[in-house]
């Protein structure tokens, strides 16, 4: 029979939640221990740090700038490159966002924008800083 003792277990960055009810130990011979862990679904998830209305406005601007066909889904995780955008298209998207939200985006920040969520998060940050 195998036994395991310990005082503490810690993880630097949890990847999945584990249901302790499904944790089991077994061993056929001395020195052999088997550990079976079953992941459980997370109860909540943060999908986007930007405000939903900002994400929706960014989606509209991206669809307009890239002439995205009707019925094509554009959401927070959509990459501009997946919609066929090149670097010039991205610059035009940023210019449209600056005009819509009355903000100014630094070139280094603009280069870091790859998804709708990236743009929306940056916009919320700049709008908050502007109103402070």
Swiss-Prot record:
Subcellular location: Plastid, Chloroplast
Coiled coil: none
UniProt KW keywords: Chloroplast, Fatty acid biosynthesis, Fatty acid metabolism, Lipid biosynthesis, Lipid metabolism, Phosphopantetheine, Phosphoprotein, Plastid, Transit peptide
Modification note: 4'-phosphopantetheine is transferred from CoA to a specific serine of apo-ACP by acpS. This modification is essential for activity because fatty acids are bound in thioester linkage to the sulfhydryl of the prosthetic group.
SUPFAM superfamilies: ACP-like (SSF47336)
GO terms for cellular component: chloroplast
Gene Ontology MF annotations: acyl carrier activity
Pathway field: Lipid metabolism; fatty acid biosynthesis
Domain called Carrier: residue spans: 52-127
Modification type O-(pantetheine 4'-phosphoryl)serine: residues: 87
Keyword Ribonucleoprotein assigned: no
Predominant place of localization: plastid
Transit peptide extent on chain: 1-49
Role this protein plays: Carrier of the growing fatty acid chain in fatty acid biosynthesis.
Protein family: Belongs to the acyl carrier protein (ACP) family.
Name of the featured protein: Acyl carrier protein 3, chloroplastic
Source organism: Hordeum vulgare
Gene that this polypeptide is encoded by: ACL1.3
């Amino acid at each position: 029979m195998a036994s395991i003792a310990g005082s503490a277990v810690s993880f630097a960055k949890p990847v999945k939640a584990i249901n302790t009810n499904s944790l089991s130990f077994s061993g056929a011979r001395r020195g052999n221990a088997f550990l079976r862990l079953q992941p459980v679904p997370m109860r909540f998830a943060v999908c986007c740090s930007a405000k939903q209305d900002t994400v929706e406005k960014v989606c509209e601007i991206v669809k307009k700038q890239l002439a995205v066909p009707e019925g094509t889904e554009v959401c927070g995780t959509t990459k501009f490159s997946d919609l066929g955008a090149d670097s010039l298209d991205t610059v035009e998207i940023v210019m449209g966002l600056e005009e819509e939200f009355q903000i100014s985006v630094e070139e280094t920040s603009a280069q870091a924008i790859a998804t709708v969520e990236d743009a929306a998060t940056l916009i919320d940050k700049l709008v908050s800083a502007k109103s402070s």
